UniProtKB/Swiss-Prot annotation:
This is GTPase Der. GTP 2 binds at residues 226-233, 273-277, 338-341. Associates with the 50S ribosomal subunit. GTPase that plays an essential role in the late steps of ribosome biogenesis.
Amino acid sequence: MTPVVALVGRPNVGKSTLFNRLTRTRDALVADFPGLTRDRKYGHANIAGHDFIVIDTGGIDGTEEGIEEKMAEQSLLAIEEADVVLFLVDARAGLLPADIGIAQYLRQREKTTVVVANKTDGIDADSHCGEFYQLGLGEVAKIAAAQGRGVTQLIEQVLSPLATALNSEQADENEENLATETNEFDEWNQDFDFNNEEDTALLDEALDEENSESIADKNIKIAIIGRPNVGKSTLTNRILGEERVVVYDMPGTTRDSIYIPMERDGQEYTIIDTAGVRKRGKINLAVEKFSVIKTLQAIQDANVVLLTIDAREGISDQDLSLLGFILNAGRSLVIVVNKWDGLSYDIKEQVKSELDRRLDFIDFARVHFISALHGSGVGNLFDSVKEAYACATQKTSTSMLTRILHMAADEHQPPLVNGRRVKLKYAHPGGYNPPIIVIHGNQVEKLSDAYKRYLSNYFRKSLKIIGSPIRIQFQEGNNPFAGKKNKLTPNQLRKRKRLMKFIKKTKNKK
């Protein structure tokens, strides 16, 4: 489960600055949702290899008279839903009564809390932060969020208790890598023929061992998400009611989301219901509970996401924010336009026109027009779900991807950089769900965004990938194991192949 980190504290202690630093706001989901306080923000972050959801709760005016009276209801909910609370204080302003009030509340909730003294730049941090130990919440982390100082160390401390051991192992590994890097580079440039199918088959076999875990589970997890009152509950119950094969309701690890196993045409599915606890029979719920946390975690845990939109309300900015999070998470996508029944022909054409205009950047996703209430079109969703999952997990080979790469380069040559043309050598699979294609070459980091989009679209069309995003990664040189834990050389690959042949022969003789 993706951990949740909540930022709490008085106004103007730097919560929003830290939030923007963690989420790199321009690239992350940052949105205000209905029912939340005005300055409450959610985002996805990846710091030091740790994926997590971060919440900015806005300013809390805690007083000695009672913190709960001054806290907004949604801020309380954020603290309850968080795995870790980062309690920000202002190192320059010192300890204030409001800080003490907030600390008292956090101690009562027995939440894992880290006191974070911000704005330590340009001052003697140790002398200014000493008084914050009075809060009784343990060690005080010292950062300067505006400059980014101490932020990475803070996240490692919070999310990786084994950070010291891991860093030690990484340091040893880096030392070893430095010693062998030159030899590996020479071997991959001289000893491996990327146009030889026997050589690339060896490579595929080794790479497949690293990527096989991501597609081992054949159970397709479907998350039904969307804004309040778009019909998520009705759609969930329509799917379950039609099939009548629900085994049991099993609470998932994601807070309050329900993981519901079901089977259809021999395929196992798990429906991730973010609309709250619901038993069969209770189909008509007046209001669907909406939790941003539940929705974001459901997206992370799903294989395929059904983004449900109300045809009568059209596409909102919140829909686009959720869509951005789905794409960032690399999840397969099916667009479901609900409440299609009863609309006039002219209104339907207007809705389709708006979809084409506002969703032109995800032309790879299937769009279904349904009525969850009456059931029309619901059964067809599973064809698109299976198609998207199959595309996201389809296996490809190095020889196939390299052929496609060379075809793309022949049709539209890479640009010149300082008088030299970027050379694209070969491509190999880098992972599944979503499909990852790793392209090796010289000066690939200098390729323009436009050419990268061209390559992505070319691979998508050539591989006929529908319903799933596709990720292209670029790597200098020839070594496909650069940066990986299990590094192999061409000779090691060939030795492994000979060993496997010997083992098979021995078994056959017995």
